């Protein structure tokens, strides 16, 4: 299983903030936004990850994350020349994906909830078909919407329907078998000129291999596409961390708990950051 983070786009809804920096490099409380989707892939046990960016932002992501060795992972980078749809990520990443399965996550989505690691690993363990993650919303017409039966098999999937068949939005996290690459190549641009992820998932639906994993009560899915939602996400992270004294999306901690970094590795990393609360958290974590 390999992972792809799609961190392209121009972030126009956040102008003028994003005129000079990628949205996914903006801070969400105490970490760059890209840390949050990266942490999800790491929690799923995925170590080989491709970060797809806009051409002008690629170097900045590489400066921030390097080759991934600081976090016990292996990072590669690619560019999306123009924002031509989420499903294009599978075409861009074809060589990287190879013959295995793949998890795609959007670079501006934040997930938090109990037992999330177990949920992710269950989805990653599936060898056939695709899994989407549903989250109940009050305004489903703003999202891709999935309808499913009592066994969580998808019955329909639509992009921003005027009359939604359910109130379960499809989040920006998708697990696919290797057919995703060929399915993406068969797609034609939608009315808005993009290769739609909903159309790709519908191909799995049509052969009966699209399942739905529910993110239910007590779970948070945060979009960061507007100034208001970006502020709300930062406030959420701050509140949870202050109450629990545990960090959300601490990549070094996840790598250490996964056995990908040693205590010495974490200590070395922490000492570079010891003047920050983040660095102090890492030192406390390993008992220093």
Swiss-Prot record:
Name of the protein in its database record = Glucose-1-phosphate thymidylyltransferase
Gene that this polypeptide is encoded by: rmlA
Kindly list the positions annotated as binding Mg(2+).
108, 223
- Name the top EC class: transferase
Q: How and how many cofactors are bound, per the record note?
A: Binds 1 Mg(2+) ion per subunit.
Q: Does the record bear Isomerase in its keywords?
A: no
What are the recorded Gene Ontology BP terms?
A: biosynthetic process
Q: Which NCBIfam families match?
A: rmlA
Task: Describe the reaction catalysed, as an equation.
Answer: dTTP + alpha-D-glucose 1-phosphate + H(+) = dTDP-alpha-D-glucose + diphosphate
Q: Name one Pfam family in it.
A: NTP_transferase
Q: Which organism is it from?
A: Neisseria gonorrhoeae
- Is Iron among this UniProt entry's keywords? no
Q: How does it assemble?
A: Homotetramer.
Which key words are in the record?
Magnesium, Metal-binding, Nucleotidyltransferase, Transferase
* Family recorded in the similarity comment: Belongs to the glucose-1-phosphate thymidylyltransferase family.
In alphabetical order, the GO MF annotations are: glucose-1-phosphate thymidylyltransferase activity; metal ion binding
InterPro entries under this entry? Answer: G1P_thy_trans_s, NTP_transferase_dom, Nucleotide-diphossugar_trans
Q: What does this protein do?
A: Catalyzes the formation of dTDP-glucose, from dTTP and glucose 1-phosphate, as well as its pyrophosphorolysis.
Question: Which cofactors go with this protein?
Answer: Mg(2+)
């Amino acid at each position: 299983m390999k992972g792809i983070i799609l961190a392209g786009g121009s972030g126009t809804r956040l102008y003028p903030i994003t005129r000079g920096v990628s949205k996914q490099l903006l801070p969400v409380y105490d970490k760059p936004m890209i840390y949050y989707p990266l942490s999800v892939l790491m929690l799923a046990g995925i170590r080989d990850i491709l970060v797809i960016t806009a051409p002008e932002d690629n170097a900045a992501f590489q400066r921030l994350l390097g080759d991934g060795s600081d976090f016990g992972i292996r990072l590669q980078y690619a560019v999306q020349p123009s924002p031509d749809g989420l499903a294009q990520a599978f075409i861009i990443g074809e060589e990287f994906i190879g013959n295995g399965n793949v998890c795609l996550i959007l670079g501006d989505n934040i997930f938090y909830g109990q037992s999330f690691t177990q949920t992710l690993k269950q989805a990653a363990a599936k060898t056939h078909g695709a899994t989407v993650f549903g989250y109940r919303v009050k305004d489903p017409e703003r999202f891709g919407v999935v309808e499913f039966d009592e066994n969580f098999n998808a019955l329909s999937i639509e992009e921003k329907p005027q009359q939604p068949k359910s109130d379960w939005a499809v989040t920006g996290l998708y697990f696919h078998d290797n057919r995703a690459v060929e399915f993406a190549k068969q797609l034609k641009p939608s009315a808005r000129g993009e290769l739609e992820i909903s159309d790709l998932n519908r191909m799995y639906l049509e052969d009966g291999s699209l399942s739905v994993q529910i993110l239910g009560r007590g779970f948070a899915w945060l979009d960061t596409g507007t100034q208001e939602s970006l502020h709300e996400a930062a406030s959420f992270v701050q509140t949870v961390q202050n109450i629990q004294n545990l960090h959300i999306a601490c990549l070094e901690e996840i790598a250490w708990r996964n056995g990908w970094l040693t205590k010495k590795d974490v200590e070395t990393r922490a000492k570079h950051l010891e003047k920050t609360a983040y660095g102090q958290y890492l030192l406390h974590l390993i008992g220093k």
